[in-house]
Amino acid sequence: MRSIQRLCAVLAIWALGAALAVAPASARPDTAAQRPTARVASATAEKAVYIPTNWDGIGELPWARDRTKESANFVLLWGEKSGTDPKNAPEDYRFDPDDILSQLEKLYSFYMDTMKFTPEAGQLAKYKIDVVITRTWNVPGLDDWAAGGYEELEEKVGAIKIAPAAAAPGSWGLAHELGHVFQFLTYLGKDGDGGLTDKSAQTFYETSAEYMAMQVYPDGGAGDLSRFLRTENLAYSSGRHQYGNWMLVQYLVDKYGGMKAFTDIWNQAKNTEHPLETYRRINDLTQDQLNTRIAEYAQHQVTFDYSNRGHFMPFINNMHGAGFINAYNGVPVKAVNRRTGHYAIPDALAPSDYGYNKIKLVPARDGARIKLHFKGHASEAAGSGWSYGFVAVKDGTPRYGAVSSSPDGQISFQTRPGEKEVYLVVTGTPKTVHHYGSLDGYTKNHRYPYEFRISGATPSGHEPGYKKPAAKGGGHWHPNGGGWVDDRAKVASTVYVGPRAAVNGESTVTGNVRIEGLAWVNGDAKVSGDVVVKDNAIVQGGADLSGDLVLGGDAEMWIPCSAGTYLMFDPDRGCDGKGGETDINLPHGTFTDKELAITR
């Protein structure tokens, strides 16, 4: 449970513009005897105000009665810098307590009465939620932008920490952080083994808080779409996905039971479960049925076919990096034998657990019948599994083919006149739900490589006369490799930027640098020498990479570094110059054309 809170703090380092939800971290006395007695103050409503002992008795948060304000479900506490009249405080410390409490009460009502997120029971029924206005105190450490959850020392009361600017009218941060409070209060103060506290649930906390905020403000945001849509192949529970992978929730809500499909996961979870295991259990599904359901969701990702599409598509069209992320809808495949229609997914882009690949196809003719022989490279240790099917699109409207989960199977799909866009969608659907933590990244996650032969269509990029799409979003195609380069960036002609790689922002890239796969350089980063950036890696603004450094997998780097191989996001590793992390995925061979013969 507390590991979830610590994780949020770690991930704050690398959020792209998203306000992270870090549960309040408190100083812990060594023994219970050192803790002052908890004090329950008088309340203005039925719920009590509870001030945690480490805030009150040892002065960690030196609150004062004349710097508080209460409503039915919340108590606001602020620091000395805002004084007793914060509406007239200096600008940096100025806020309106009445407005913040009004926002919070409306959010509370929405989550409780409209979403029916959780019953008003346990600690939620006993105590008002503590809301600390940060950056207004004289003591150090109270400087969070926005954080939510509960006070972790005694686990009695929900808590939000938020800066004045983050709590302005219409605050997304308040909606997101109160979402975290509700999540934790689904199980705090209740007996039994309930609660999404397994490490594999870590990403789902942020996924859910973002989704909850979207219900309040449907046109106000849609999460970190750039990271998610650039890394759709990574595991569903990847930390790279935690603000953007809410679309699976939306699919389940749309098709399988409304909002209750989402809230039941939180209210009926067991503390040993991955959220998808909870969903499987409470809906009485087999693992195969769960896998098919998630594969159908992946098919919907081709056109983002959801009931709230009109609200979030503007964010997809204008997201950070839209010029290169939206240039291609899907991933490339490599030709094993183009003449026989034999292709393979690059190993680095093979889907992990409930990640997926969208492979755009060019039909041989209008109304073509497409035949496919799919074969996965199975690993007993991984419990390998795949689910795959076709999607045809005409005038923006999708039509879905049946999903197959055969590891060595043949399927066909009859296109209709006018269906010029066709996709093969392959989802990693293992035989069991693995419990990856959010920071158990690329080298610790199983990937599920595969090959296929196809007739009646050709993967886009391999057809005769192929032409790249026009470069959009203020960028151009780099002459050496064909990747997308921001017009503001400085990229030498000697630098290789692969067909699907990108250099974004005002970055400077020189020397013999290679940027490959779906990797990208971001912000004002500098990359030089013989550096290789590959797979799903990101070089963030502030980085200055040189020498023979290799950055791959799902790694991100934002610091100066000149040596080492980094294949997994690890905020504690820094620049140590060492070799790459050991990958649990083993090498495999290549199937013959005969093994992939299309026989029906």
Role assignments for model-derived ranges:
Residues R6-L7, E155-R230:
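Zinc-dependent metallopeptidase catalytic helix centered on the HExxH motif
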Residues D30, T272-A470:
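Beta/coil-rich, acidic/histidine-enriched accessory regions frequently appended to metallopeptidases
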Residues D30-V75, G79-K156, P164-L178, F182-T186, ...:
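Zn2+-dependent metallopeptidase catalytic core
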Residues R227-S307:
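Active-site-proximal alpha-helical
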